[in-house]
Amino acid sequence: MYKDCIESTGDYFLLCDAEGPWGIILESLAILGIVVTILLLLAFLFLMRKIQDCSQWNVLPTQLLFLLSVLGLFGLAFAFIIELNQQTAPVRYFLFGVLFALCFSCLLAHASNLVKLVRGCVSFSWTTILCIAIGCSLLQIIIATEYVTLIMTRGMMFVNMTPCQLNVDFVVLLVYVLFLMALTFFVSKATFCGPCENWKQHGRLIFITVLFSIIIWVVWISMLLRGNPQFQRQPQWDDPVVCIALVTNAWVFLLLYIVPELCILYRSCRQECPLQGNACPVTAYQHSFQVENQELSRARDSDGAEEDVALTSYGTPIQPQTVDPTQECFIPQAKLSPQQDAGGV
């Protein structure tokens, strides 16, 4: 059965390999991930029409781009299950870094927006957040394009390179992705500082997601460059190690970031108004305080009596010992005529 599988499928034999079932297991997880990601995309598109809070809505286009990138990661898993050849090698070396760069750039853009929101500032527009995500990933696209073009045109094909060369080049191509990952990690930590508590839950989701991603990347890079050669499992374990890390990280993106974000959006849509706390109470207080200060300034330009009333209403309360008991029955704004004064006596 195993020999028939190899002879009939060639480079695709891992898709039906029952003796080494890692290909079948990862294939099943990737297909399930594709289905779940499509359902989450439809859920986000449905909820986009019901979100009333602009601060929440502005990040949704970037999250849709993030979901499309995760969908691409699950599809890319098949390029690692299939044997390395002239067709799968360029796809691996180009899309792996580009798709992960898009994912971490989207997380970075969201975290950067949260840094403003937790401090009571106004959110970036949705175009600004989306441009940050796309702009941060452009460098990885340029790097991957140049590398694949050079390999394909200079005569040294991927299949002619040694496993050690392939692995080193693969990791070196991902240096910028590692930088994006580290930057997103530190920016997400900055979202923990600020008076608006409700926005911090989004920052915690990004922080935990990136933390698990860092652990996954440290493990698979260590195995690819050091572990497999030491265990004398190179190149047999090279593709399984990278593919397992790819599928695992894609599921981490869904379970630790997208699903909780979708739950938050759903709770927000069930309320009649945006989530309490999204409009930071500190900001509202500061705004009202500024309005009161402006009214005080206008009062100082008017007559002295009006100024005294304004200061009594908005300023520091008058201490009891400073009040003259003989003045308690008089209203400062009104001036009584002599006739009214005599009648009152």
Curated annotation (Swiss-Prot):
The chain crosses the membrane at residues 28-48, 64-84, 94-114, 124-144, 168-188, 205-225, 240-260. It holds the Pfam family 7tm_3. This is G-protein coupled receptor family C group 5 member D. Belongs to the G-protein coupled receptor 3 family. GO terms for cellular component: extracellular exosome; intracellular membrane-bounded organelle; plasma membrane; receptor complex. Homodimer. PANTHER family: G PROTEIN COUPLED RECEPTOR, CLASS C, GROUP 5 (PTHR14511), G-PROTEIN COUPLED RECEPTOR FAMILY C GROUP 5 MEMBER D (PTHR14511:SF16). Widely expressed in the peripheral system. Expression pattern is high in pancreas, medium in kidney, small intestine, spleen and testis, low in lung, colon, leukocyte, prostate and thymus and not detectable in brain, heart, liver, placenta, skeletal muscle and ovary.
